[in-house]
Amino acid sequence: MLDKNGLSYIFLNHINCKSTSKQIIDKVIETLEARSKDIFKQIIMHHIHNSSNTNTGKLGFYGKLKESFDKEIYLNIKNFNNRKAISELRMSAHKLEIEKGRYVNINRNERICKNCDLGEIEDEKHFILKCPAYSVYREGLSRLIYQELGIDLKYSGLVGIKAIFLQNDVNIMNKLAVFIRNCWEKRTSLSS
């Protein structure tokens, strides 16, 4: 087990140093635990990024945003509905055509937005940056993002989306959540 995890040196070093059995065991357990956690994190991140690169899986958008195996700042938002709005969009737990079509086996390139005439796939990027149906809400968010971060959402594409979603500022994350919630409400009213 130690060899498999590249840790036999710990055992050998402690034997040569005349450490007690308890010291050796404690060091092996401590190091093995840390190594196991590291391997687990690497496997999870690899899976997430592989899914986002293929554009076929549920983790497509999430994988483009997730950079590290840490708690995301938006989880500190006190308002449950705001936190939920960001979570649902990040995890693709929504009803955009990109997800609805996935469940009924519609080809990805045929999952077109029904709320505008751009003829684009209705995915998270289209929803946040492009769909004219939400332009009123987007203008306010765009102004704030430009003032606070110097990012012009109109031209930044996925890089801009990622910069917003990875913010360390809970205030900006709250504004993003309000934007998302307003867009969902508008989308629901357009669908009824």
Predicted regions and their residues:
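A helix-boundary/hinge signal
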Residues: 1-47, 52, 124-126, 133
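Family-specific functional microsites
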Residues: 27, 43-192
